[in-house]
């Protein structure tokens, strides 16, 4: 098996004129007119991608990774314009976050419009490139439209790709040439990644020529392991130029002594393990709480900046903190208004200078608090509705809102150009997560990413200091690809046989081409098939019922209990088995009798058999 070929950090990047010379004139003219020069990450990526190689691009936030992965594919629509009546998806972009996918769709508009206008100005055929998004938020009508009239570029999630491969929608993927996996580090070390790896192999099996795979990441270690995840048995070029990203990290304790909190315990304490004193066991030595100090200081920092993104480690904390920030901001505004206008009606406050006025929030989408509507801070997490998330994201991008309190829902890759400060409450879950989160500030090439950390107690202070030090040094945790997750194998097996009968050996070979299953023993594979075929039935575990039919003699796998003839229910009529009887296998169960060791149950009672030939 070929290993990944790595372009090591510090290796000379290809000359810009040489690489740009591989693009068509409209694409080259648009890029040179829009940007001063390509970044090292872009040059390395385009060199590998234009040569037809699989590529893993590792570069800090704000290095132009999205364009590095897409531009060659966009240029292909100029080189080879789609002909009328041959609509097919050429580029498949897979994002671990729905919000990231929507963001990429928005960011593709500029190059698409620019290249199209340049081509028209030069008198060349104007490519008509359509972009579609399919995720769990996509309405059923839109999913049907995407299936019937596939877009040129499809943005989706790992789960939606899996569902497409297991339905008639897979026909829309028959023309895919390029797959881009963004934020690949977020899935490579998880079972979700193993699930995606098998989906990519199933996609290749649909095509005459395997797709070109491109992975993007800002924070990943070790690179060779992630390259193996991306390519499976195929070699991958790792593009990893020397990083010039600058960080400004500060760990802030808003009180002189964490062991002597002067503020009384607050009823709005946010600590998940809080005692009466407002702190967890690690630091509760007096009756005070750290949270009032943290909240006041966060409001101070937000007021000093254009737009701030605050990260919390749970949805509960995000909601409660959003409410408290709004309460503090509103109280300050009312106090300032009262001082400036002593004769004003009580409750009068000066309007927020940002001018952002979103729709009235509903419970569960603004953070708890006094119940008043404030334009100062908004919450963003998975429980917030799709429409509200979109409003908050757009307001944050354009600088129309001062502060957004989010969980990991805004951690990955989303372009937040207006954000100039990130605040992390409590230690981030990992060094990689910390880099991703702080990287949301200063997201443009050459800008400094500024992050402020607020530990909640002494133990958290130690964790935060260590994480911040490792972030500065770039010492990211190493990930490991899960080895042979059999539950993922079982899920994909059932899904694949629901589409068509499989050759058992061929399916084993396909699964083994994915990195997570590269060492899968055939004995373990057979055990999974035994389980799915119902070899271990139990009245106590309904999930052990047969799901597939395994013909051991012919080595085939077919749809089982959920889609097979045996699961059909006779509702007062006769169920004819004459066709199966003529096959010559004998017995009422027809051809199914020959599959010894397969356990199954009838969904009806046989009263009599008629028309049997002697």
How does the language model describe each region?
Residues 1-17:
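Interdomain "pre-motor" coupling segment immediately N-terminal to P-loop NTPase/helicase cores
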Residues 14-19, 23-29, 50-56, 60, ...:
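Helicase motor core with emphasis on the C-terminal RecA-like subdomain
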Residues 36-51:
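N-terminal pre-P-loop "Q-motif" helix
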Residues 65:
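Glycine-rich phosphate-binding P-loop
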Residues 108, 230, 566-575:
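Active-site-adjacent alpha-helix of alpha/beta-hydrolase-fold enzymes
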Residues 261-262, 561, 588-590:
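Short conserved micro-motifs at the rims of enzyme active sites and ligand-binding pockets
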Residues 558-568:
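Short, amphipathic alpha-helical interaction segments positioned at domain boundaries
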Residues 572-614:
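C-terminal catalytic histidine-bearing segment of alpha/beta-hydrolase fold enzymes
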């Amino acid at each position: 098996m070929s290993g990944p070929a790595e372009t090591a950090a510090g290796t000379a990047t290809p000359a810009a004129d040489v690489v740009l010379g591989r693009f068509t004139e409209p694409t080259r003219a648009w890029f040179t007119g829009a940007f001063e020069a390509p970044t090292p990450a872009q040059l390395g990526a385009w060199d590998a991608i234009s040569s037809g190689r699989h590529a893993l691009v590792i570069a800090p936030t704000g290095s132009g990774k999205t364009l590095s992965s897409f531009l060659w594919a966009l240029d292909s629509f100029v080189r080879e314009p789609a002909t009328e009546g041959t609509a097919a998806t050429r580029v498949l972009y897979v994002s671990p976050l729905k919000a990231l996918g929507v963001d990429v769709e928005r960011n593709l508009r500029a190059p698409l419009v620019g290249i199209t206008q340049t081509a028209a100005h030069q008198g060349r055929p104007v490519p008509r490139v359509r972009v579609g998004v399919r995720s769990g938020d996509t309405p059923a009508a839109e999913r049907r439209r995407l299936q019937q009239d596939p877009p040129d570029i499809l943005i989706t999630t790992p789960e939606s790709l899996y569902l497409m491969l297991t339905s008639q929608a897979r026909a829309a993927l028959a023309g895919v040439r390029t797959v881009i996996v963004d934020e690949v580090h977020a899935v490579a070390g998880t079972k979700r990644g193993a699930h995606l790896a098998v989906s990519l192999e199933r996609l290749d099996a649909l095509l005459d020529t395997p797709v070109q795979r491109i992975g993007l990441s800002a924070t990943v270690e070790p690179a060779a392991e992630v390259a193996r995840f991306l390519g499976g048995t195929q070699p991958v070029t790792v593009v990893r130029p020397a990083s010039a990203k600058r960080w400004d990290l500060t760990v802030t304790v808003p009180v002189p002594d964490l062991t002597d909190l002067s503020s009384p315990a607050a009823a709005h304490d946010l600590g998940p393990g809080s005692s009466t004193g407002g702190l967890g066991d690690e630091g509760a030595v007096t009756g005070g709480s750290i949270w009032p100090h943290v909240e006041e200081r966060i409001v101070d920092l937000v007021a000093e900046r254009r737009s701030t993104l605050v990260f919390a480690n749970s949805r509960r904390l995000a909601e409660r903190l959003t409410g408290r920030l709004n309460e503090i901001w509103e109280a300050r505004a009312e106090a300032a208004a009262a001082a400036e206008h002593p004769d004003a009606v009580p409750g009068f406050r000066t309007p927020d200078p940002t001018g952002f006025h979103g729709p009235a929030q509903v419970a569960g989408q603004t953070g708890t608090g006094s119940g008043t509507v404030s334009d100062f801070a908004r919450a963003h997490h998975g429980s917030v509705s799709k429409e509200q998330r979109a409003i908050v994201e757009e307001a944050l991008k354009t600088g129309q809102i001062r502060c957004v309190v989010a969980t990991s829902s805004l951690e990955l890759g989303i372009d937040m150009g207006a954000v100039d400060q990130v605040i992390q409450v409590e230690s981030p879950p990992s060094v990689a997560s910390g880099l991703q989160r702080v990287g949301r500030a200063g997201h443009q090439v050459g800008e400094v990413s500024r992050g402020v950390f607020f530990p909640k107690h002494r133990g958290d202070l130690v964790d935060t200091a260590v994480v911040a030090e490792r972030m500065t040094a770039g010492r990211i945790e190493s990930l490991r690809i899960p080895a042979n997750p059999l539950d993922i194998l079982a899920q994909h097996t059932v899904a694949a046989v629901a589409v068509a009968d499989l050759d058992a050996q061929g399916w084993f070979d396909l699964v083994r081409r994915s990195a997570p299953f590269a060492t899968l023993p055939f004995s373990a594979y057979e055990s999974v098939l035994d389980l799915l075929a119902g070899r271990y039935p139990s009245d106590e575990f309904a999930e052990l019922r047969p799901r597939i039919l395994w013909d051991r003699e012919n080595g085939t796998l077919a749809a089982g209990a959920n889609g097979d003839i045996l699961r059909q229910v006779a509702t007062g009529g006769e169920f004819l088995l004459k066709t199966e009887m003529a096959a010559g296998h004998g017995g009422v169960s027809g051809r199914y009798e020959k599959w010894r060791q397969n356990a199954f149950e009838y969904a009806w009672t046989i009263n009599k058999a008629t028309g049997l030939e002697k």
